[in-house]
UniProtKB/Swiss-Prot annotation:
EC number: 7.3.2.1
Family the UniProt entry places it in: Belongs to the ABC transporter superfamily. Phosphate importer (TC 3.A.1.7) family.
Compartmental location: Cell membrane
Species name: Bifidobacterium longum (strain NCC 2705)
Protein's job: Part of the ABC transporter complex PstSACB involved in phosphate import. Responsible for energy coupling to the transport system.
Protein name as it appears in the record: Phosphate import ATP-binding protein PstB
CDD domains: ABC_PstB_phosphate_transporter
Lipid bilayer topology: Peripheral membrane protein
Length: 259
């Protein structure tokens, strides 16, 4: 089952530069939460702090708390690698490992975490993860073919299978459909709706229609001016956000008057 995330007074820095300030948000388990907002407002930056992925950038650091079921992911005794096992990430562009087969792509995260599996267990895990990503029937007869040979939409679902194979509690998705055609986009959206019964899902999207279709809750990020830190402007259930937002800036953004 998915787990709850609570972000309390989060400030995100790159060196001395304050990129995002004072984010407070409660992300419900087994729901889809969408992050929307204009370019540069910090939504992807906040997303990457939820699994400490931003730390690959030298000088990046966080003030405040990011709690997963009450445990602060930034406590000194917390291993970032362990965080990324519990919180999976699917990136903007499909990124299957180009030298690996479909099968090996699914198992890559498991083996990276030094888990040795018997062949029968590995086969079962590959089938389970690919079924979970709605890809099994399309690839079951060519598991040893290169993952890079799949279509764009299939590659993205393969990346989702790779993410779920390590049994995370949360799935983060950074514009997962931006490089896909409309048919592949709908396939991924259908998959997201199915996955939320097992995972907490947070998705960054520039597509307002997509957020309205798939999200249970929506967070609108904004920035006051170029060079100023981004911030969480407004958070609401998605029906309220798109039909009756109680925030003028959110209403202007959703209606296309800026952004």
């Amino acid at each position: 089952m998915g787990q709850r995330i609570d972000v309390n007074h989060e400030n995100i820095y790159y060196g001395d530069f304050l990129a995002v300030e004072d984010v407070n948000i409660n992300i419900e388990p087994n729901k889809v939460t969408a992050f929307i907002g204009p370019s540069g407002c910090g939504k992807s930056t906040v997303l990457r702090t939820l699994d400490r992925m931003h730390e690959i950038i030298p000088g990046a650091h966080v003030e405040g708390e990011v709690l997963l079921e009450g445990k602060n992911l930034y406590d000194k005794d917390v291993d970032p690698v362990a965080v990324r096992r519990d919180v999976g990430m699917v990136f903007q562009r499909p990124n299957p490992f180009p030298t690996m087969s479909i099968r090996e792509n699914v198992l890559a995260g498991v083996r990276l975490n030094n888990h040795h599996l018997a062949k029968s267990d590995a086969d079962d895990l590959v089938e389970w993860a690919l079924r979970g990503a709605n890809l099994w029937e399309e690839v079951k007869d060519r598991l040893d073919n290169p993952g890079i040979g799949l279509s764009g939409g299939q590659q993205q679902r393969l990346c989702i299978a790779r993410a779920v194979a390590v049994h995370p509690q949360v799935l983060l998705m950074d514009e997962p459909c931006s490089a896909l055609d409309p048919i592949s986009t709908l396939a991924v959206e259908d998959l997201i709706n199915e996955l939320k019964s097992d995972y907490t899902i947070v998705i960054v999207t520039h597509n307002m229609q997509q957020a309205a279709r798939i999200a249970d809750y929506t967070a609108f990020f904004n920035l006051k001016a170029v060079g100023q830190p981004g911030h969480l402007e407004y958070f609401a259930d998605t029906i309220t956000m798109f039909n009756n937002p109680q925030n003028e800036e959110a209403e202007r953004y959703i209606s296309g008057r800026f952004g």
